[in-house]
Amino acid sequence: MQTSMFLTLTGLVLLFVVCYASESEEKEFPKELLSSIFAADSDFKEEERGCFGYKCDYYKGCCSGYVCSPTWKWCVRPGPGRR
């Protein structure tokens, strides 16, 4: 039982050391990855969403293919039961 506890503890310490070493090597990698994800994400939002969810009212209409929801006052896609 003592041997298995010793091996488990040694394995956890080894895992910690390996993770710490790889993290210190690649400190900039997560920042670069996140910035590239958010940069690509903002590019797709314009094409994908159009003006879905934008605020609208009597004076400011919606993009083509969307209607202003009278209840929520934002742009939605027209569908059955929507006015």
Curated annotation (Swiss-Prot):
Q: Name one GO molecular function term.
A: ion channel inhibitor activity
InterPro entries named in the record = Huwentoxin-1
Q: Is Signal tagged as a keyword? A: yes
Kindly list the cysteine pairs connected by disulfide bridges.
51-63, 56-68, 62-75
Does the UniProt entry include the keyword Signal?
yes
Q: Which UniProt keywords apply?
A: Cleavage on pair of basic residues, Disulfide bond, Knottin, Lectin, Secreted, Signal, Toxin
UniProt xrefs under SUPFAM superfamilies:
omega toxin-like
Q: Which GO terms describe its cellular component?
A: extracellular region
Q: Where in the cell is it found?
A: Secreted
Q: Span of the secretion signal?
A: 1-21
Chief location bin: secreted
> What tissues has this protein been observed in?
Expressed by the venom gland.
Propiece residues: 22-49
Question: What is said about the domains?
Answer: The presence of a 'disulfide through disulfide knot' structurally defines this protein as a knottin.
The similarity comment for this entry is: Belongs to the neurotoxin 10 (Hwtx-1) family. 51 (Hntx-8) subfamily. Hntx-8 sub-subfamily.
Role according to the record: Agglutinates erythrocytes.
Q: What is this protein called?
A: U5-theraphotoxin-Hs1b 2
Q: What is the species listed in this Swiss-Prot or TrEMBL entry?
A: Cyriopagopus schmidti
Q: What is the lineage of its organism?
A: Eukaryota, Metazoa, Ecdysozoa, Arthropoda, Chelicerata
